């Protein structure tokens, strides 16, 4: 290790260092900005290794807990959730090197003890961690927290997407160069006792990779530990690192490269080095020497045996999951293996596979046996960029795994070009006025005058907002538009050039997309007179994470645009003629309705009813009565989980939560999600799955070459796993993988939230999304996936797709096969091997 006062000689980065930087960055999961916040697997960067190995790695590198406290499992055993047979099965499946007892009784004794002897695995410490552990008073701890605050403050200014009134001058530079430029004038570090901070940064190389190489060399980090060291450094600013990883993801999806995360890593590493050079005392230097010796020890990534406590908790987690799957398979086994009747249904309703839809679908089916519901990804197979009026670009209404293939512009129905221009000009004018007014309210001087002179005028608005009578802010989707115009808004699917870009769909594209969507939904006949294509969204106020309650398959947007596009294309007579040539005959009296399911209030909105033929008015009346009853049943079921059941006004209270700006739990989102079932609805119809199952319609008998099976396993199944693991991470360790206390959130740059007024950007879900204040509402379980298809077909998809194989081989989810008779017959065991399931077990 070079002494701290040696000149900062720039070192040439080696291929090994480049690989270590890339590897550390790949371990970080992306964080989408608030405007299209979607669920992300927080362990995405570790999908190449097993779930068990990842738990060991994260504990070794950063001492992060990835399992529940042992008391949680003890309570599950005490309550009977985990039975002795579940514990025995978990023990039998555990690897020998976990060094666990063979008897359940011995395991129960270990489970009762929170303080077994723990042999700590090697931990790769950063400078900040060593300073914190020494904790010679609060001064050095304060410096490490100060480092995080300063980096976070700088990131909020640099990445700001329009929240701040004053923009950072250096935003035109790349991150590392912009940070060096801003540091030149920043005296905060010196004020905190970090001497010569600006000089130290200036002495280090201007190239960010060379700066990392120099610092790593000067700190004496062992070669084998460099990637772990850099990973740990990123975890200490994990929120902003995750956002930078999102920028990398977005560029890579477009075929580009982005080095923002690597440059942010350089900033963090240089900050750590600045803290390092402040401590020249023997105590710190000795602690650092020991830390680097420990970092040089052989890693234990793939062995839990080095940590007995972790092994015990892991086998208890396995037993907990075995118990859930046992109950799920038993419930599915009790249902008669029904077959679709083949008769024409009165109504068909396609919903998103979202677990919240399961409750509404079950309610509809319980009211009428003539109703057929279908599950499909909520973007309905139309990967579009939807551009609202007055915008140059739009948002991607498709899963984040995909890029939009089509651009669809919003338009006002029945307008001339002059009226279109007038509406556009008026919306832009109103937005400029509001922006100017906002600038006046927030500027350094006028903000004080504004509050003193106009504050009292807002008393009525504050009161009506508090009573949930009015919205606290304008709906951004309709902001600046008149009510008469809002009622005529809709997607325009006709092809035309807008701003030099092709928008809409030509005839060949419409027919091809329509066929692909119908076959992917296993929906080739018979067709009802009314077919609902139901996207979903949510309603809440004062909720930065509102997009997280909208449709993940639509990229964190509501799904009505996709549903209306799909319905319009499927109602096109020329499209239907083309479909008949391809073997799909839609009757002339079938009409597709674009709809939106509000998952907070459970209301269903029907769109474009002016296009409904007069012959279908009675069908519409019957449908509305059905939906009203289904909405009421669904609200009453959700009221129990929301804690308002049993009240005379339970339904109204469910609705009121959507307008209450003090409500931290407007709805439970996807809490409780635990299974994914791809099979005909006949297999699960009549079974109460408790709003915990993703239900995807799939009939392998209609799947030519199993192309739809591949689509399901590579897209919806993967996205469902992301959602499941985000909820898992936010439950087992909300401090590391979640967003903390929603009550304390402050929005930073419109990108994410801080917990309080400082600290790192928060990732994952707020505590209130998984816990009701008394107990966990979400159960931390890896996803149980059940697919009805031949074993050979499922195995072929696994073998041909490395990402899917990593998920199933590394136990990030549990895969089961359903036989042609509708019974769960086999469990996937890794290595393309299946284990038959005893139907009597």
From Swiss-Prot:
Keyword Cell inner membrane: yes
Primary location class: membrane
Binding site for Zn(2+): 352, 354, 536, 551
Keyword line: Cell inner membrane, Cell membrane, Membrane, Metal-binding, Transport, Zinc
Membrane topology: Peripheral membrane protein
GO cellular component: plasma membrane
Cofactor(s) needed by this chain: Zn(2+)
Sample GO molecular function, one term: zinc ion binding
Subcellular location as annotated: Cell inner membrane
Pfam families: DabA
Keyword Cytoplasm on entry: no
Family: Belongs to the inorganic carbon transporter (TC 9.A.2) DabA family.
Quaternary structure note: Forms a complex with DabB.
Function summary: Part of an energy-coupled inorganic carbon pump.
UniProt name for this protein: Probable inorganic carbon transporter subunit DabA 1
Protein's organism: Bradyrhizobium sp. (strain ORS 278)
This protein's encoding gene: dabA1
């Amino acid at each position: 290790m070079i002494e701290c006062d040696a000149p900062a000689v720039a070192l040439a980065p080696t291929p090994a260092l480049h690989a270590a930087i890339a590897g550390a960055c790949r371990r970080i999961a992306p964080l989408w900005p608030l405007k299209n916040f979607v669920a992300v697997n927080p362990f995405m960067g570790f999908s190449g290794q097993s779930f068990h190995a990842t738990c060991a790695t994260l504990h070794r590198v950063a001492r992060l807990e990835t399992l529940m406290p042992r008391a949680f499992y003890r309570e599950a055993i005490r309550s009977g959730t985990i039975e002795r047979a579940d514990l025995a099965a978990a023990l039998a499946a555990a690897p020998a090197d976990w060094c666990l007892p063979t008897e359940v009784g011995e395991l129960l004794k270990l489970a009762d003890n929170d303080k077994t002897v723990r042999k700590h695995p090697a931990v790769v410490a950063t400078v900040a961690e060593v300073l914190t552990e020494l904790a010679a008073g609060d001064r050095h701890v304060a410096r490490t927290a100060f480092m995080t605050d300063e980096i976070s403050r700088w990131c909020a200014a640099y990445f700001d997407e329009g929240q701040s009134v004053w923009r950072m001058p250096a935003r035109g530079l790349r991150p590392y160069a912009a940070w060096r430029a801003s540091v030149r004038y920043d005296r905060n570090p010196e004020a905190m006792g970090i001497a010569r901070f600006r000089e130290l940064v200036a002495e280090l190389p201007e190239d960010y990779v060379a700066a990392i190489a120099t610092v790593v060399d000067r700190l004496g980090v062992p070669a084998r530990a460099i990637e772990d060291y850099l990973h740990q450094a990123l975890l200490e600013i994990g929120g902003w690192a995750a956002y930078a990883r999102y920028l990398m993801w977005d560029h890579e999806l477009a075929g580009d490269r982005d080095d923002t995360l690597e440059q942010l890593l350089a900033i963090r590493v240089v900050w750590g080095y600045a803290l390092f050079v402040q401590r020249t005392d023997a105590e710190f230097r000795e602690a650092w020497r020991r830390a680097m010796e420990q970092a040089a020890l052989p890693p234990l990534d793939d062995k839990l045996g080095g940590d007995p406590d972790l092994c015990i908790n892991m086998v208890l987690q396995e037993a907990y999951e075995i118990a859930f799957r046992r109950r799920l398979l038993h419930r599915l086994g009790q249902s008669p293996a029904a077959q679709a009747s083949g008769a024409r249904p009165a109504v068909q309703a396609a919903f998103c596979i979202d677990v919240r839809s399961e409750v509404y679908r079950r309610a509809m089916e319980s009211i009428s046996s003539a109703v057929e519901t279908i599950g499909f990804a909520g973007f309905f197979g139309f990967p579009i960029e939807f551009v609202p009026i007055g915008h140059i670009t739009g948002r991607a209404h498709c899963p984040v795994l995909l890029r939009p293939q089509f651009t669809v512009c919003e338009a006002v129905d029945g307008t001339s070009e002059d009226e279109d221009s007038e509406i556009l000009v008026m919306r832009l004018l109103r937005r400029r006025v509001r922006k100017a007014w906002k600038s006046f309210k927030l500027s350094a001087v006028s903000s004080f005058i504004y509050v003193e002179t106009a504050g009292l005028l807002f008393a009525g608005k504050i009161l009506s907002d508090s009573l949930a009578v009015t919205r606290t802010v304008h709906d951004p989707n309709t902001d600046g538009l008149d009510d008469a115009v809002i009622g005529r808004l809709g997607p325009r699917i006709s092809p035309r050039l807008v701003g030099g870009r092709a928008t809409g769909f030509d005839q060949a594209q419409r027919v091809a997309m329509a066929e692909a969507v119908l076959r992917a939904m296993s929906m080739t006949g018979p067709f009802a007179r009314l077919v609902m294509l139901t996207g979903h969204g949510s309603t809440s106020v004062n909720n930065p994470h509102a997009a997280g309650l909208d449709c993940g398959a639509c990229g964190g947007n509501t799904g009505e645009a996709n549903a209306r596009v799909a319905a319009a294309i499927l109602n096109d007579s020329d499209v239907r003629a083309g479909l008949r040539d391809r073997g799909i005959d839609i009757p002339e009296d079938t009409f597709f309705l674009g709809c939106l399911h509000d998952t907070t209030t459970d209301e269903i909105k029907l769109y474009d009813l002016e296009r409904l033929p007069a012959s279908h008015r009675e069908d519409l009346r019957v449908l509305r009565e059905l939906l009203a009853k289904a909405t009421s049943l669904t609200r009453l079921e959700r009221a129990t989980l929301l804690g308002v059941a049993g009240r005379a006004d339970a339904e109204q209270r469910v609705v009121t939560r959507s307008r209450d700006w003090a409500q931290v739990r407007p709805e439970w989102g996807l809490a409780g999600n635990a299974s994914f079932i791809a099979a005909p609805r006949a297999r699960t119809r009549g079974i109460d799955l408790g709003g915990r199952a993703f239900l995807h319609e799939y009939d392998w008998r209609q799947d030519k070459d199993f192309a739809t099976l591949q689509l399901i396993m590579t897209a919806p199944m993967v996205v469902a796993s992301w959602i499941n693991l985000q909820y898992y991470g936010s439950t087992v360790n909300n401090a590391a993988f979640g967003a903390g206390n929603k009550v304390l959130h402050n929005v930073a740059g419109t990108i994410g939230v801080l917990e309080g007024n400082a600290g790192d950007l928060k990732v994952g879900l707020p505590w209130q999304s998984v816990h009701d204040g008394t107990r966990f509402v979400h159960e931390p379980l890896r996803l149980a996936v059940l697919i009805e298809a031949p074993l050979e077909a499922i195995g072929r998809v696994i073998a041909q797709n490395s990402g899917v194989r990593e998920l199933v081989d590394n136990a990030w989810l549990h895969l089961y096969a359903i036989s042609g008779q509708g019974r769960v017959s086999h469990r996937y065991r890794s290595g393309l091997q299946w284990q038959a399931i005893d139907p009597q077990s």
